[in-house]
Amino acid sequence: MATNGHFASIGNSASDTTAYEHGVQVIDENKEFKNPNLSQYLSLENVTPSGFNYHLISVFGSQSTGKSTLLNHLFGTHFSVMSELERRQTTKGIWMSKNKNESSSMASNILVMDVEGTDGRERGEDQDFERKSALFALATSEVLIVNIWEHQVGLYQGANMGLLKTVFEVNLQLFLKDKNTTHRSLLFFVIRDYSGMTPLQNLQKTLMEDMARLWDSISKPGGLENSNVHDYFDFQFYGLPHKGYQPEKFVEETQKLSLRFCDGQRDPNLDARKGEFSDGGVFLPEYHRRIPADGFSRYAEGIWDQIVNNKDLDLPTQQELLAQFRCDEILREVMVAFDETIVPFEDKQSQAARLGEPEILGGLGAAMRSSRTKAVKAFESEASRYHKGVYQRKRAELESKADTRLKTLFQGQLNAAHKSGISEFSEAVTAAVKSGQKKGTGYDFAEIVNEEAKKAVDKFEEVARATVVDGTSWSDYKQELALYEKELAEVSARLRRDEMRRLASRVERWVQSRLGESVGLEFNALGSGRAGGGAPEKGDQPTEKKFWDRVWNVFVETVLDAERRFTDRASSFDASLEEVDVGLWRLRRKSWGVLRAKIDEEMIEGNLLLKLRENFEDKFRYDDAGVPRIWRPTDDIEGIYTRARESTLTLIPLLSKFRLDETSAPPPLDRWIGHTPSSATSADEEDLAPIGGVDEEEGKSLEEEMTIVSDAKRQELTVRFKKAADGVYVEAKRSAIGGMTQVPLYFYGLLLALGWNEIIAVLRNPAYFFLLFVCAVGAYITYQLNLWGPIIKMTEAASNQAVTEGKKRLREFLESSDTGRQAIAMSTPGGSGRGGEEHEMSRLNQQGKSAAADEDVDDL
């Protein structure tokens, strides 16, 4: 691939954004500053008008260590990277590009500078540009990414410690002359090819010790002799896996790392001197150079002029890089053969992980053991003739990289065995339970769980023994086995809880059915104010006073029966006493919810008003013996009405609150339910409705929980009931008045005189006499049974219905004939009718009023 240097002239002739696809060259390889190009690029990227709202990051490190690759992955830039077919300088000079990663978590307007790598063979011993470019990056950037390999940590020249020392010295000389201002920067050490064998904290400690020694060794201006490196620099660290050997892991970690390039705040609780470093946003306000974006080009050019004119700086040549370079090449060569064997397994494992279907890979253990042995022997035969220290270090690095990947495969294999084993265990237990339920025979849940758990553990150990690589630090899988057994126990407990939940649900449905019937019967009995219908046949106290006592007793007995059922069945689950206590506690709470829902259903305003009216009519329309009353003018209708109404009105306050007649207080619901068991979890409580007087956080007292009808509803209910009762009373009065007849006395004499012949004819004729006798006996029996009233009402109803039907048929006849239609037309507007009014024939009562009005009263 072409190097960045090959594109150096693009910005000189093009002005569109595509001309800067690979960024803009700020300083070329000849140390010349490209001010016009930089200014134009910032304008095209819309950075110039952003004021202080921009950030600058630089990266430096040894050549061919993947700095450009790192920036491209972090910021989506297109810096040219080194070809895998050759090793030579890629980035020439200093290049800049704007962040192309559009993640919302990153700061806006991030500018990234790719600095030419140090220790390149192209420049050889001439390291002046390396020094000056590093100083320029430090002088202009908020964050300086130091790109080093893990194996370079602890080295002096390999880790560019000499260059950092020079940076510290010149930084004090050039930028700290203003004693009133402290310029701070962040040195972000990105440790490449991080294997994880050495903890990152240890690498941090080593690097910070090196930083402290470097700072102590530099000459400081007057007044700064006692200064500390932490006075001017902050430090952060991050380890990245090998891009070639762990590409997916590398991409994943770079994505995580990119999220840290956002605005942050200093944590006052962290002390860098104690090895405490931030892992939050890297852009702190004190890092910013406070140079407006539109003046950055001129500022950067001035800084470069100061640096390029300082001719006293130089860096020594690093002596051991050859051995390190060759060992790296050999390591990569042996890893190629290693990859040929291992990568297919890694691909299968990663693909299965992405699909969420972990797979146990056959033959993995043998392939792992063989590939590791071959890689170590091949490296030993080729690299052992080089520098012993480098060889030993690189061999350890090879083993670390190989073991890291093999350990990942091993753990992935165990993870697959873990997940598949858990899934199979759960399915096997569920299938066994369903089989027992279908057969209709009892099954021992605890025995099923123990048997399936033993099978699952045996299978897991078999997979682990076949995959493990002896002699490695991770060959002991006892911890994974313990975790597996622990999760099996957790799944067993969850399955047991689920089974107990299903048992509880069945018991709750049984309670709901029983309470629905029993409580429904008690409420239905309210419709009768006489003996019978659920009321006691004997006793002076009305049955309504004991209403809530009966409801509570039925409720308690039903729940006790349900608890016995639940406890007996739970014993086969091997459930602990704590789990049974939680189940019984939930059952009581759920049962109260069922009872309260049933009460609320029965106490709906319409239902309650209907029951009150039925209760009133039962007391008003029937006598104490249960015989319907036939109202006569001489009856004390007002007295009976008043007693029946007042008796029914006493039900409203009685039903408004759930109170026991024995104690004149609400039932002891809080004591009956009991306290929340200590073993209850949030999952046990999340589906439970709060109960007043039981749950403190509910904010309701027990008295409020037992209030069925509010005071406002009681008043409204009383008014509506009285209106309905008044309608019944008016109907009774009309019935009594309608039965009155006033026959004049002279009518009887006239009847006797005019009908004497007919009377004699009837008495002399046996047939007529017998018929008269039968009619007289029937009339007497009807009178004794108080049936004349119903017969008269039925006759009136039949006659009224006949009249209504006759009117209907007459109207239909008139509408179907020509003469009738003409007569109807005359009554319409424009005809000879009275002003076009239309009158509908209505059925009238005995007082000449519309019968519909009486029906409206009856409906109340």
Curated annotation (Swiss-Prot):
Molecular-function annotations in GO: GTP binding; GTPase activity
Cross-referenced InterPro entries: G_GB1_RHD3_dom (IPR030386), P-loop_NTPase (IPR027417), RHD3/Sey1 (IPR008803), Sey1/RHD3-like_3HB (IPR046758)
Keyword list, A-Z: Coiled coil, Endoplasmic reticulum, GTP-binding, Hydrolase, Membrane, Nucleotide-binding, Transmembrane, Transmembrane helix
Claim: Protein biosynthesis is one of the keywords in the record: no
Membrane spanning stretches: 743-763, 767-787
Ranges per topology, Lumenal: 764-766
UniProt feature coiled coil, ranges: 443-501
Cytoplasmic side: 1-742, 788-860
Biological process according to GO: endoplasmic reticulum membrane fusion
Gene Ontology, cellular component aspect: endoplasmic reticulum membrane
Region (Disordered): 818-860
Membrane topology value: Multi-pass membrane protein
Domain GB1/RHD3-type G: 51-300
EC number: 3.6.5.-
Compartments (UniProt record): Endoplasmic reticulum membrane
Cited Gene3D superfamilies: P-loop containing nucleotide triphosphate hydrolases
Family note: Belongs to the TRAFAC class dynamin-like GTPase superfamily. GB1/RHD3 GTPase family. RHD3 subfamily.
Its biological purpose: Cooperates with the reticulon proteins and tubule-shaping DP1 family proteins to generate and maintain the structure of the tubular endoplasmic reticulum network. Has GTPase activity, which is required for its function in ER organization.
Name of the molecule in the record: Protein sey1
Source organism per UniProt: Aspergillus oryzae (strain ATCC 42149 / RIB 40)
Gene name as annotated: sey1
